[in-house]
Every structure is written in C-alpha cells, then in structure tokens.
Regions:
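Cytoplasm-proximal transmembrane signaling helix
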Residues: 16, 286-333, 337
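N-terminal membrane-insertion alpha helix
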Residues: 19-45, 49, 75, 315
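Extracytoplasmic/periplasmic sensory segments of membrane signal-transduction proteins
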Residues: 40-47, 56-145, 188, 202-203
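Extracytoplasmic/periplasmic sensor domains and loops in membrane signaling proteins
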Residues: 81-92, 118-150, 181, 192, ...
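Helix-start (N-cap) segments at beta->loop->alpha junctions
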Residues: 154, 167, 176-185, 202-203, ...
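Extracellular/periplasmic juxtamembrane segments that couple receptor/chemosensory ectodomains to their
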Residues: 230-297, 350
Length: 381
C-alpha cells in the first residue's frame, strides 16, 4: 500500500475516532441533562406535596381559630345552645364544604364528648371520642390548639382543634377537618403526577367505622388507598416493597413494560409526628425516553455527517498541500535519475517550506546535470 492510500486510511480513522468521541460526549451531556430533569421533576413534586399538606393544615387552623374566637359562638357554646350555633354557622359552613373541601366542623366538650356536628346536626350528641381522638383530648386538656392529620370515624382528615374560651375559662373546643383531596388535586394540576394517599389499614379499620372498607386490591402492603386521583395509573406500580421504604421522603425511577415512571413517596405524619401512611405520586416519564432516543439518533446522525465532512476536508487539504507536491517531486526525481527532462517545479520552488526546499534542490541538480551534459557535448564536438 503506497503512502497515498495509507495517509487516506489514516485520515479516515482519525475522522471516525474524532466523530465517535464527539458524539459520545454530546450524547452523554444530553443524557445527563435529561436525567437531571427527571430528578428535578421528582424533587419538585415531593416538595410540592409537603407544601400542599402544610397549606391545608394552615387553612384548617385559620378557620378553626376564626370560629373559636367569635363572641357569639362562645356565648352560644357556653349556654349549650345548639340551635344558636347552627343558625350562625351553618350557611357559611355549607359554602366552606361545597367550595373549599371542608368536610367536618364539630364542637366538643371536655374531655372529648361530641356536642354538635355542623354537617350532621342531629347525630352524635354526647358521643365519647376519647378512645380515638387524641387531638381533641390534648386540646381540651392543655387548652392549646392542635393541628395536623388524624383518623376519625369518617376517615383521614387534615384537622385543627382550637380551644373555645371565655372569661370564665375553657368551654370546649372547635374542630375543622379538611379533605385530603385538595392536596391530591393541587399536586396533579401543578405537576401532572397522579397521586394517592395510603393509610395504615389497621388504624383505618379500628377507627374509621363510618366508611366502607375498600376492595382488597386497594390494600397494598398493609396500607389502604384512602383517596386517589386515578387508581389505574397508580395500581401497576404499587407493591409492599414500595411501602416498606416509607420512612422518609424518597424518589425513584421505575421501568415497567419498557416504560419509565417517576415515583415519589412522602410519609403521612399525624399531629404527633408519627408515621401513619404515605402519599404516593407517579407519572409516566416516556417523554424523557423519547428525548433520550432523539438525542441518541441526533448524535449518531451528526457523527456520520462529521465523518464525511471531516474526512473530505482532511483529504482535500492533505492532497493539495502534501500528496500532490510529493508526487510531483517524486516524478521529477525519477525523470532526473533516468536522464529525462524533469517536470516543471517552478510552482513548488516558490514555496517557503520543506517542499519548496526540495523543489529548489531538484532544480539545482537539474541545472548541474544540464551543465555537465553541455560540457560533454562541447568536448565531443
């Protein structure tokens, strides 16, 4: 194989190596950005779930604080006048229920005896709540507001229990309970994740006796689905192993049937900070898979184009600057050795590099050879 073909093969290999390295680096950078976007989505969703829970707790507290501080309510509660309380609160509480997710409003006498349920005026008068409503017991015992999540007869609620006091002292307490659905709806609206809240099945069975027990398929790893945005979206990704991880906020990427999914777990803590369940959020991450495939395809196509362009450019430059001049010098040297008139090297001789030096040297040799030939001819004459 002559130098021309060796050099062209070498240039082709250099172009391939350069293009492959460039494509690999480009895909690596694109893939890193996509993976970072996935993690950012997961972390943002986890933060938003926690923020939404805290927001609902604050809303429950604001409502309970407002009602418990109204003078007319204090007066009616002290007089144990249920009709007066209902007349003052029921219209506003119906609006709160229908538009803002308030599911419970209840007045409670110490230590934990139900006095009036706003949304069930005739039900539960005098019911003893002390066996399962620790928030109420603590609020009535300490006279301090209690806020957070707790399971009641009608299931899980985001609650705030505020003492009702007048100049004569503690009368009892007023409780607001919000549905968890607001947390789920806000999260899905803002992130696209389908969300569900899962609570310890044993606790729900023992306490939430006014709601039906869910189907067995909605009980996973000892946790039952209390509220979900879309059960069909969550179901394939749930397993006992997932709930075994619910000790802290965690995120995970799961591949199922060739599709990537993002999964977020946020522990549900009761008002005492004890874990009673988890919020699970999932989202189809196939859009990121498509981006990764496009990145791979684009980098491969770019590498192929780069190989063609780089090889062509290198061949043009090397042929013009080196191979063609070397070929001309080689032909001139061969002609000189055979005693033939050499090719014209004037174009190469004007160059200020090594090729120009070689061309000028050959011109000098050619001139010397011509002089010797002329001398011999004159002697022979």
């Amino acid at each position: 194989m002559n130098i021309k073909w060796k050099s062209q093969l070498l240039l082709f290999m250099v172009a391939i190596t350069t293009s492959v390295v460039s494509a690999y680096s480009g895909f690596g950078a694109s893939n890193a950005m996509i993976e970072s976007a996935k993690k950012r989505e997961l972390n943002t969703t986890a933060t938003l779930i926690q923020s939404n829970i805290n927001e609902q707790i604050n809303k429950a507290s604001a409502r309970a604080s407002l009602v418990s501080s109204l003078p007319s309510i204090k007066q009616a509660f002290r007089a144990k006048d249920r009709d007066a309380i209902a007349t003052r609160l029921l219209p506003a509480m119906i609006v709160q229920r229908d538009q803002f997710g308030v599911r419970e409003g209840q007045f409670i006498l110490p230590p934990a005896s139900s006095f009036l349920r706003i949304y069930a005026l005739k039900d539960g008068h005098g019911e003893d709540l002390s066996g399962f409503r620790q928030m109420v017991l603590v609020a009535n015992r300490t006279g301090e507001p209690q806020r957070g999540m707790e399971i009641g007869r009608r299931g899980l609620s985001i609650r705030a229990v505020y003492p009702v006091k007048d100049d004569d002292g503690l009368i009892g307490s007023f409780e607001i309970g919000l549905s968890f659905s607001s947390v789920l709806t806000q999260t899905k609206t803002n992130t696209g994740f389908d969300v569900g809240v899962f609570i310890d099945d044993k606790l729900m069975t023992e306490v939430a006796q006014l709601i039906p027990r869910p189907d067995n398929e909605r009980i996973v790893g000892g946790y039952q689905a209390v509220e979900v945005t879309d059960w069909t979206a969550l179901k394939p990704l749930l397993s006992p192993a997932i709930f075994a991880k619910v000790r802290d906020v965690s995120t995970e990427l799961i591949t199922l049937n060739g599709n990537d999914y993002g999964l977020v777990l946020v522990p549900v803590l009761d008002y005492k900070g004890e874990r009673i369940g988890a919020v699970v959020a999932v989202r189809d991450f196939s859009e990121f898979q498509i981006q990764q495939r496009w990145a791979l395809t684009g980098n491969i196509a770019m590498a192929a184009l780069q190989i063609v362009l780089l090889t062509g450019a290198l061949l043009i430059v090397v042929n013009a600057m080196l191979l063609k001049p070397f070929e001309a010098i080689a032909n001139a040297s061969k002609d000189l050795a055979e005693g033939k008139p050499s090719s014209d090297l004037e174009d190469l001789a004007v160059r200020k590099d090594e090729i120009g030096d070689m061309a000028r040297s050959l011109q000098t040799l050619q001139a010397s050879d011509n002089d010797r030939n002329g001398y011999k001819e004159s002697q022979n004459a």
